[in-house]
């Protein structure tokens, strides 16, 4: 029996290795369109490969996976983050869980993952062919695949693990086979805020911020980094993921509301500010930073509120207090465009989960055609969750394929 795996990335290699272990007699070939395999793994986590997460801070799966949580809830019963941890350690890759719950190789080097995968593939007899771009696929009793427009091969089964496609046209061949395609759009990006003085605070971090998309219920909390182009950091990346499709529809022009202190209850903030006034009446406002925010950020807020920096707290007045409360909790910025995140490219969209059997990752319209990884309409916030989805869906597909062909 033969199977072609289209895409030499994380999901493709993980599927191939596990399939070959479960069904050694299956002939497995990985086809990669570029000259190098596992290129996205190489840059994951800034070159350190954030390969999973402890999930300790995830109360409900949809907070990590804005799209695909229902499929993964089922799939995690077979292979979850704990299984991932054990799998890699058993493969000779010691792991470490950071304070932020992100899981990395102890070596902090993504190349260790790449070397391990290539070594295992070689030992298991998996064939890897680079510079093979799939140009067509025809279904029948067997699948006929055409590469580079002139090389034809036939296989008993095919697994598509090509990752996220930036354009729907790249998925047209799957649509022709009867699959519903969700328009792919970026889902992890930073916010460009041109012509705003906030960019002068480049490098300033608000450790506990909350950012919401104005006019919606979408919001996220976490650390916010001010950059020379606008805003980045975990809270921005989360919000970009939660609102990926809506933000795309707005053509990346929208307003955000920032609570620099992760608090929007004006009464609570007023009580706190009034306590500062009582305790520091003769001190200059600029010298007492509320909520321990950065002094540079505090100066920015005072300038925006048009409050003189040499004014004393006792002279602030009710109007001044209200201005500060509003800017601490509800500071508005206009976003014009998006930026990339560490050269990583994650999309929402792809093959609709309506077209997939959750138990097996098999196509509902084509027997012996399987999917794994970001080609599916599954994506996550930053923190190792996207790679975990790749490992899980690849493992589920490997088990399903092995069970079918071992039974023949």
Regions found by a protein language model. Give the residues of each.
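Glycine-rich FAD pyrophosphate-binding loop
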Residues: 4, 20-46
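An anion/pyrophosphate-binding glycine-rich loop and adjacent beta-alpha core
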Residues: 35-37, 43, 51, 55-58, ...
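A glycine-rich dinucleotide-binding beta-alpha-beta segment and adjacent secondary-structure elements
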Residues: 130, 299-379
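Glycine-rich active-site loop/strand segments that organize a redox cofactor
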Residues: 46-97
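Beta1/beta-strand and adjacent pyrophosphate-binding region of the FAD-binding site
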Residues: 1-11
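Short hydrophobic core segments
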Residues: 4-6, 31, 134, 152-165, ...
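A conserved short coil-to-beta-strand element within the FAD-binding core of flavoproteins
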Residues: 130-143
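A conserved FAD-binding loop/helix module that cradles the flavin
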Residues: 161-177, 377-406
């Amino acid at each position: 029996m033969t199977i072609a795996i289209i895409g030499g990335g994380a999901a493709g290699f993980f599927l191939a290795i596990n399939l070959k272990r479960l069904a050694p007699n299956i002939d497995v070939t990985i086809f990669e369109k570029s000259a190098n395999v596992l290129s996205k793994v190489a840059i994951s986590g800034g070159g350190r490969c954030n390969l999973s997460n402890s999930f300790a801070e995830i109360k409900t799966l949809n907070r990590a996976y804005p799209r695909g949580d229902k499929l993964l809830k089922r799939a995690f019963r077979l292979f979850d983050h704990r299984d991932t941890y054990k799998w890699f350690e058993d493969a000779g890759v010691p792991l470490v869980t950071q304070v932020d719950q992100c899981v990395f190789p102890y070596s902090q080097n993504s190349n260790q993952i790449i070397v391990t995968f290539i070594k295992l593939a070689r030992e298991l007899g998996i064939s890897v062919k680079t510079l093979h771009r799939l140009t067509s696929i025809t279904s029948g009793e067997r699948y006929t695949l055409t590469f580079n427009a002139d090389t034809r091969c036939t296989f008993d089964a095919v697994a598509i693990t090509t990752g996220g496609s930036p354009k729907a046209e790249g998925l047209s061949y799957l649509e022709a086979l009867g699959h519903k395609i969700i328009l792919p759009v970026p889902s992890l990006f930073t916010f460009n805020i041109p012509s705003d003085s906030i960019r002068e605070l480049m490098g300033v971090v608000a450790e506990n911020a909350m950012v919401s998309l104005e006019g919606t219920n979408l919001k996220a909390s976490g650390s916010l980094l001010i950059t020379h182009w606008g805003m980045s950091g975990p809270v921005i990346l989360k919000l970009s993921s939660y609102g990926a499709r809506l933000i795309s529809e707005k053509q990346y022009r929208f307003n955000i509301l920032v609570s620099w202190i992760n608090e929007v209850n004006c009464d609570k903030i007023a009580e706190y500010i009034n306590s500062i006034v009582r305790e520091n009446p003769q001190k200059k406002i600029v010298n007492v930073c509320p909520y321990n925010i950065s002094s540079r950020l505090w100066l920015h807020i005072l300038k925006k509120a048009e409050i003189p920096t040499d004014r004393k707290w006792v002279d602030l007045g009710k109007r001044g207090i209200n201005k500060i409360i509003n800017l601490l909790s509800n500071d508005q910025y206009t976003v014009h465009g998006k930026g990339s995140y560490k050269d990583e490219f994650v999309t929402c969209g792809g093959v609709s989960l309506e077209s997939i059997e959750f138990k097996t990752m098999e196509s509902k319209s084509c027997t012996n055609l399987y999917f794994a990884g970001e080609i599916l309409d599954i994506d996550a916030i930053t923190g190792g969750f996207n790679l975990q989805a790749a490992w899980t869906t690849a493992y589920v597909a490997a088990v399903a394929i092995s069970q079918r062909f071992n039974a023949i």
